[in-house]
């Protein structure tokens, strides 16, 4: 890909973008971490809290990317996206949603920062400032073709 072309979030590797944007969120210092961030599990089906101390920024970057790509997702949608398989011992496993409080808190933080806004039809949409911010970070991500 030529250096003169502008890169958007859609052009870069999702994993690399989420890492870069979570580092950007941490550096900016605009995001307030809740006091429960180091003790909470991310879902009912999890046994332990996340090992990564910066998991909150990573989840926020992932949520911002998902709203960029698909407008109108709300808390319930993110509960389904981050949900997973609950193991029930000898009984069969079933799908279980993730925590809604974590998604709600991150959406409120991103809204306070001006990256997303409430959609009148339901869910959240990305603002023009948020789109510009995410595209700037995507422009700094290295594009390596394997």
UniProtKB/Swiss-Prot annotation:
SUPFAM superfamilies: Winged helix' DNA-binding domain (SSF46785). One of its GO terms (molecular function) is structural constituent of ribosome. It holds the Pfam family Ribosomal_S19e. Keywords: Ribonucleoprotein, Ribosomal protein. One of its GO terms (biological process) is ribosomal small subunit assembly. SMART domains: Ribosomal_S19e (SM01413). GO terms for cellular component: cytosolic small ribosomal subunit. Coiled coil: none annotated. InterPro entries: Ribosomal_eS19, Ribosomal_eS19_CS, WH-like_DNA-bd_sf, WH_DNA-bd_sf. Belongs to the eukaryotic ribosomal protein eS19 family. This is Small ribosomal subunit protein eS19.
